[in-house]
């Protein structure tokens, strides 16, 4: 519970910073809601598998970002969230979309340059 609250606070703070720049109807709250079931997977050892609710959230997130601006905003939220999880398994974060059958042309990472997303 404390972990979820910490993640929620970090994502909310980052949303307030990123939202004015994104010019998108997309919300970081969407990221938090959709990816909350993934927290255990993101902190797990390598070769873990995301849960079905986690993958459902990843697919919902992809569907919620239909425009380039939305995708850039989603990327910025993912980037901020990845940087805020102290025991994040970077390999699991990068593998998450593929393990859930979602194709995105960037890795979920604290170092992703979201401004280059044009798909």
Swiss-Prot record:
Expressed in roots, stem, leaves and tendrils of the mature plant. GO terms for biological process: lipid transport. Keywords: Disulfide bond, Lipid transport, Signal, Transport. SMART domains: AAI. One of its GO terms (molecular function) is lipid binding. It comes from the Eukaryota. This is Non-specific lipid-transfer protein 3. The lineage of its organism: Eukaryota, Viridiplantae, Streptophyta, Embryophyta, Tracheophyta.
């Amino acid at each position: 519970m404390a972990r979820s609250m910490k993640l929620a606070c970090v994502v909310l703070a980052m949303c307030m910073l990123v939202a004015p720049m994104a010019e998108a109807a997309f919300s970081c709250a969407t990221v938090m809601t959709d990816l909350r079931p993934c927290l255990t997977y993101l902190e797990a050892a390598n070769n873990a598998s995301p849960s079905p609710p986690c993958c459902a959230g990843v697919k919902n997130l992809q569907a919620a970002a239909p425009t380039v601006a939305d995708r850039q905003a989603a990327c910025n939220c993912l980037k901020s969230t990845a940087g805020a999880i102290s025991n994040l398994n970077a390999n699991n974060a990068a593998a998450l979309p593929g393990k859930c059958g979602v194709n995105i042309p960037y890795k979920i990472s604290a170092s992703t340059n979201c401004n280059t997303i044009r798909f």
